[in-house]
Swiss-Prot record:
Purpose: Catalyzes the cyclization of geranylgeranyl diphosphate to casbene, a diterpene phytoalexin with antibacterial and antifungal activity.
Catalytic activity of the protein: (2E,6E,10E)-geranylgeranyl diphosphate = casbene + diphosphate
Protein's recorded name: Casbene synthase, chloroplastic
Record's GO cellular component terms: chloroplast
Cofactor note: Binds 3 Mg(2+) ions per subunit.
Family from the record: Belongs to the terpene synthase family.
Protein's organism: Ricinus communis
Length: 601
């Protein structure tokens, strides 16, 4: 019996996930002699929806793709955290007073547009810009529209020009990269004299990460500055050296905002000559204040899981409560999004459980039964599931029932349907990967990446997060996500590429589906080294697509788009040196900085 599409059941005219790519504009990218239809409709023509025979097939032998996942490094530590209301109130009172002072500083800067933009950048880097979100949007819009030639008018040096360029682009304003033309010589190369300006070179390096397709000047800027920064960092003053080392390790634009704020506060404090004491105190107090809220929420989430007492029923699954909550905070760290974070955390936990079940334990026959049950979304399916899957299936349906009750009280019960359908589509993608694995099939690269961009969980997590956002009060954002927009696909493709590039060896040792590397090698007849280089270039180009989509007119606000971008940022951080989710040692320092260690006041 064919696995039904829940989305198609509810609306026969609605495009199935596997057919949505046809709605995207065609943008082909060149990679040597290989033309990759990255965002084109041609991928659709190669992608075959699983046939009834395929969906009905089962293995003749019960083969479990058993895997060993290391235990959590945290134990039950976070389930026993205590929250001190008086400590939070003390921070809160001081933050309220300082917030007024900082707003006065922001307003007083408006007489000089460049000074305003630099201050906005400082607030963003310190992690406190969310307090003044509306003011910042209004100020930047006014400056951008009234002073389109701001950099030339003010005769900005390289350091300042790059900050202005980066700030506008990061807020969705497409400032022209031509602002950097004046820093080139008569031969069209960046002036050698710029090498004497370390701060300016660092600023240009950070700005170059906001490039879009076709901006050769930013490609040149990246190569020029990276070469200089890598070779000269050892010769600089200690604090500037730390700035450069951090930027080379993790550029600000592709970093997780909350982690970047933690790092920058320390660097700003060390800059004794230039720091503003009011801004510094405000940032430190606010960081610790918000950290207390995150600790309380992580405790609630950990206790919720512990009280379910399900771990013994699914011992093969990864125990990653702290890392899961790291996902939630990476997307939405601001205090007002507590409910959103809890929804994200529970959904990511469910994704992790089902992913581990299909990927590392279930037989093909069991995977088929689970996929059908998720597609039908009905408790009556329990009787067909093996006992260990019943636990997961009940948790899935019960959790979404809880979401519906909570969101009904907020007038958003309609949003749960979109989350449910996104979950069903995710499991369809998992099932297809299991079929490929079971048949020993290496799919075409285009087919693999298209399906793989969805099985990253990004479309589902994005949808689930929007369910909990109070300012999203209608269907607009959910209907936009349903179209598999280019931002979502580019972010998902980036996550899939980075994930595979760092974890494919370990996963294949336990019989995982072919990775993007295998698919590309098989389709194009290139060596592994060649494939890796090409895929790394594709991952870089994903960021250009992401940047472009955040700077074009959209039915969704830039603020909401950035939450999807944050998932790509999270992957950039978590998979930089391996699978940081599976090996929780790799994320330990980040979890400590977010949830354990406060900033010294």
């Amino acid at each position: 019996m064919a696995l039904p599409s829940a989305a198609m059941q509810s609306n026969p005219e609605k495009l199935n996930l596997f057919h949505r790519l046809s709605s995207l504009p065609t943008t082909s990218l060149e990679y040597g002699n290989n033309r990759f239809p990255f965002f084109s409709s041609s991928a659709k023509s190669h992608f075959k929806k699983p046939t009834q025979a395929c969906l009905s097939s089962t293995t003749h032998q019960e083969v479990r793709p058993l895997a060993y996942f290391p235990p959590t490094v945290w134990g039950n530590r976070f389930a026993s955290l205590t929250f001190n209301p008086s400590e939070f109130e003390s921070y809160d009172e001081r933050v309220i007073v300082l917030k007024k002072k900082v707003k006065d500083i922001l307003i007083s800067s408006t007489s000089d547009s460049v000074e305003t933009v630099i201050l906005i950048d400082l607030l963003c880097r310190l992690g406190v810009s969310y307090h003044f979100e509306n003011d910042i949007e209004e100020l930047l819009s006014k400056i951008f529209n009234s002073q389109p030639d701001l950099v030339d008018e003010k005769e900005c040096d390289l350091y300042t020009a790059a900050i202005v360029f980066r700030v506008f682009r990061q807020h969705g304003f497409k400032m022209s990269s031509d602002v950097f033309s004046k820093f080139k010589d008569s031969d069209g190369k960046f002036k050698e004299s710029l090498r004497g300006d370390a701060k300016g070179m660092l600023s240009l390096f950070e700005a170059s990460h906001l490039s879009v397709h076709g901006e050769d000047i930013l490609e040149e800027a990246f190569a020029f500055t990276k070469d200089y920064l890598q070779s000269s960092a050892v010769e600089l003053f200690p604090n500037l050296k730390r700035h450069i080392t951090n930027a080379l390790e993790q550029p600000f634009h592709s970093g997780v905002p909350r982690l970047e704020a933690r790092k920058f506060i320390d660097l700003y404090e060390a800059d004794i000559e230039c720091r503003n004491e009011t801004l510094l105190e405000f940032a430190k107090l606010d960081y610790n204040r918000v950290q207390l809220l995150h600790q309380q929420e992580l405790c609630q989430f950990s206790k919720w899981w512990k009280d379910l007492n399900l771990a013994s029923d699914i011992p093969y699954a990864r125990d990653r409560m702290a890392e899961i909550f790291f996902w939630a905070v990476a997307m939405y760290f601001e205090p007002d999004y507590a409910h959103t974070r809890m929804i994200i955390a529970k959904v990511v936990l469910l994704i992790s459980l089902i992913d581990d079940t299909i990927d590392a334990y279930a037989t093909m026959e069991e995977t088929h039964i689970l996929a059908e049950a998720v597609a039908r979304w009905d408790m009556s399916c329990l009787e067909k599931l093996p006992d260990y899957m019943k636990v997961i299936y009940k948790l899935l349906l019960n959790t979404f029932s809880e979401f519906e009750k909570e969101l009904t009280a907020e007038g958003k019960s309609y949003s749960v349907k979109y989350g449910r359908e996104a979950f069903q589509e995710l499991v369809r993608g998992y099932y297809l990967e299991a079929v490929w694995r079971d048949e020993g099939k290496i799919p075409s690269f285009d087919d693999y990446l298209y399906n793989g961009s969805m099985t990253t969980g990004l479309p589902l997590v994005s949808t689930a997060s929007f369910m909990g956002v109070q300012e999203i009060t209608g269907l607009n954002e959910f209907q936009w996500l349903e179209t598999n927009p280019k931002l979502s696909y580019a972010s998902g493709a980036f996550i899939r590429l980075v994930n595979d590039l760092t974890s494919h060896v370990t996963e294949q040792q336990r019989g995982h589906v072919a990775s993007c590397i295998d698919c590309y090698m098989n389709q194009h007849g290139v060596s592994k080294d060649e494939a890796v280089k090409i895929l790394q270039k594709m991952a870089t180009d994903c960021w250009k697509e992401i940047n472009e989509e955040c700077m074009r007119q959209s039915q969704v606000s830039v603020g909401h788009l950035m939450r999807i971008v944050n998932l790509a940022r999270l992957t950039d951080v978590s998979y930089k040196y391996g699978d940081g989710y599976t090996d929780s040692q790799q994320l330990k320092q980040f979890v400590k900085g977010l949830f354990v260690d406060p900033i010294s006041i």
